[in-house]
């Protein structure tokens, strides 16, 4: 009998959500995703600290922002030596509300990759799913720079991304689960909210059906998992990005994994209505969704905090 990981691969592209090269070699994902928090975690480990030191010292006198981008690309290049597919590299979250600056930073990242001999087709630029971020992605996609819109918590965000023609979205599962569990308090019944009844799973499933119903080609990559049940409940999603810990658990557990999602499911939603992708509708609908608006803001704050910590590490190694 196959492992659950091998069985999952029959339905879904498996992506590693980590900056740990050794974990990728062991688990053999197709793609990999990184973010400021994962890179910060990696460079604090002895095995990866030399990459930080070498990058910082090679570009002394450059700004922390420039060194950070070079460090992200250094990680990305090594990741692409391991995975056969793509790597996602994130634009500084401090630019989440600045369309022009996001576009310029993304162009710079792609230029660094291309200077290192990496074709742009193997890189996804991660951008927060704010209105400004989505509009930056619209510009970048038109230039042939493929984007991964992250911190996505609701259908209106996904609809706006589709209208912008982005390559891929990363709707979060675990953080939605966290919010609902916290807000339910004593009324939360864990066993009743597992699998297909998990609010995070339901959100991604809704987005998946919407995209398939309207023939939207943007790829859907479920992200932010808290447990294996959430992953198995989304088998069949285009891609799933999963932590090494959960990938290992899947690899060590035998069992078949049936597809929970299929393109046909979208066609069953005959009454679905295409959402207005305009700015007013986007901002109104996001504001009315307490969970999505709170988790988007929180996610940006957390990434900004880790970006500042990374700046401090770079400065401590003589890059400032």
UniProtKB/Swiss-Prot annotation:
Disulfide bonds: none annotated. It catalyses: D-sedoheptulose 7-phosphate + D-glyceraldehyde 3-phosphate = D-erythrose 4-phosphate + beta-D-fructose 6-phosphate. GO terms for molecular function: transaldolase activity. Its EC number is 2.2.1.2. It is found in: Cytoplasm. HAMAP family: Transaldolase_1. This is Transaldolase. It comes from Bordetella parapertussis (strain 12822 / ATCC BAA-587 / NCTC 13253). The gene is tal.
